[in-house]
Amino acid sequence: MAHSEEQAAVPCAFIRQNSGNSISLDFEPDTEYQFVEQLEERYKCAFCHSVLHNPHQTGCGHRFCQQCIRSLRELNSVPICPVDKEVIKPQEVFKDNCCKREVLNLHVYCKNAPGCNARIILGRFQDHLQHCSFQAVPCPNESCREAMLRKDVKEHLSAYCRFREEKCLYCKRDIVVTNLQDHEENSCPAYPVSCPNRCVQTIPRARVNEHLTVCPEAEQDCPFKHYGCTVKGKRGNLLEHERAALQDHMLLVLEKNYQLEQRISDLYQSLEQKESKIQQLAETVKKFEKELKQFTQMFGRNGTFLSNVQALTSHTDKSAWLEAQVRQLLQIVNQQPSRLDLRSLVDAVDSVKQRITQLEASDQRLVLLEGETSKHDAHINIHKAQLNKNEERFKQLEGACYSGKLIWKVTDYRVKKREAVEGHTVSVFSQPFYTSRCGYRLCARAYLNGDGSGKGTHLSLYFVVMRGEFDSLLQWPFRQRVTLMLLDQSGKKNHIVETFKADPNSSSFKRPDGEMNIASGCPRFVSHSTLENSKNTYIKDDTLFLKVAVDLTDLEDL
């Protein structure tokens, strides 16, 4: 997500993601400005003595730039005010927004004076330079990049730039001026060139090959070359040759015709010989087919005989076994005629036959049951997927907050940041939260390795408006004030806080068309050096806490 250079220079200006044209009231620090009226001391930083940038006021009443007050705290364990030597207590330092507005509305001269006599407020200084006619800019042509005043760009492009484009007089294409002559002499398809055969005509370069097919000066072979004529000359002279050598050409044609007749006669003889050979081969094939049929029948008979032999062998084995069983039964019958009852044996055999019949019928039913089982398995998988989806939904609802406030616990910070650095998971989303039971559906998005101007150096934190179930009943665009916080886990409440009011003209706060709008927030929310400093306690047990609070003032509850 790219931001413009102007945006990258604003440490805590709230901007939309993917927005290259957003305008914010701010100015470049460490730059000399010529104020219309002499800069009052109350607008100067007590540390760097330059105009206040993002002013903060201490408990003793003195004002410092945001970066200067941070430097004082980082350089000294007990920061001292350089004016009255009072100890600067962190809990008494606050952002002086009133002073900031006054500073941003101070009038300054354009740095391009006296050429530009514009007087603008300090907060719009950079915006003015983007349009100032006397600002030095490079030529838009990347190959040129000559520096000039913005007001002279149009004239430079139309008359002086060596890399400007002009239309070719012949093909009407736009060509860079420095390449125009080479284009005409070597590649322009419509540029007039002389005939390669030096005839009197000039033709467009793209039609040279077409012209050569009709050029009277072109060299070509006599039309009777295929019959043996070896004459070669200009197209205009060949007509005279054809008239003068008509008799010779006819003799060549007759000779060629005689040769063709001889060739045809030889081919007929060869064809008759081949037809005779084909008939002989056909008779041989029929003979082989007849023999093959006989072999097939013989093989079939042999196969039947072999199967009969195998069956006979099997039956012989069974007969021998049955014969042995019969002998045993006869012995038993002879020995115990009064005790043997064969009816029970017959009944048992009949019972087994019925059971076999039932099992054969069960096979078909098993096939049907297998099909039904497959259908039920498919339905069960669908229900499992729906249950998983519902379970995820219940988890979100269970952790949802309906007061317009979100406390987001980000665990495993080091692992997630490493994944962001490696490009696997560049951002993480919080669980949704709501301004009320039927209110706006919102969430937070964090880039642990930074995004845009904060990539690689800062943690970027954004606020996201999501599509909700009651959007049609809510007022749009979203207009509430939003506060983003990084919570201090030491108990000293040294939180990092940034607040902004939703811009009703931004598409980030319109009614969502998709699942969520473009995120809006601070790409340079907190630097990695501050966040990961062991002296601070923003990260504890590899966990940090982020808070998002929405001002519910004037928000009508459904």
UniProtKB/Swiss-Prot annotation:
SMART domains named in the record: MATH (SM00061), RING (SM00184)
Annotated function: Adapter protein and signal transducer that links members of the tumor necrosis factor receptor family to different signaling pathways by association with the receptor cytoplasmic domain and kinases. Mediates activation of NF-kappa-B and probably JNK. Seems to be involved in apoptosis. Plays a role in mediating activation of NF-kappa-B by EIF2AK2/PKR.
Subunit (UniProt): Homotrimer. Heterotrimer with TRAF3. Associates with TNFRSF5/CD40 through interaction with TRAF3. Associates with LTBR/TNFRSF3, TNFRSF4, TNFRSF8/CD30, TNFRSF11A/RANK, TNFRSF13B/TACI, TNFRSF14, TNFRSF17, TNFRSF19/TROY, RIPK2, MAP3K14, MAP3K5, and TRAF and TNF receptor associated protein TDP2. Interacts (via C-terminus) with EIF2AK2/PKR (via the kinase catalytic domain).
Cross-link (Glycyl lysine isopeptide (Lys-Gly) (interchain with G-Cter in ubiquitin)): K318
SUPFAM superfamilies: RING/U-box (SSF57850), TRAF domain-like (SSF49599)
Entry text on domains: The MATH/TRAF domain binds to receptor cytoplasmic domains.
CDD domains noted in UniProt: MATH_TRAF5, mRING-HC-C3HC3D_TRAF5
UniProt name for this protein: TNF receptor-associated factor 5
Subcellular localization, as worded in the UniProt entry: Cytoplasm; Cytoplasm, Cytosol
Family indicated by similarity: Belongs to the TNF receptor-associated factor family. A subfamily.
Annotated spans, Interaction with EIF2AK2/PKR: 345-558
GO MF annotation terms: identical protein binding; thioesterase binding; tumor necrosis factor receptor binding; ubiquitin protein ligase activity; ubiquitin protein ligase binding; zinc ion binding
Keywords per UniProt: Apoptosis, Coiled coil, Cytoplasm, Isopeptide bond, Metal-binding, Repeat, Ubl conjugation, Zinc, Zinc-finger
Disulfide bond sites: none
Domain MATH: 403-550
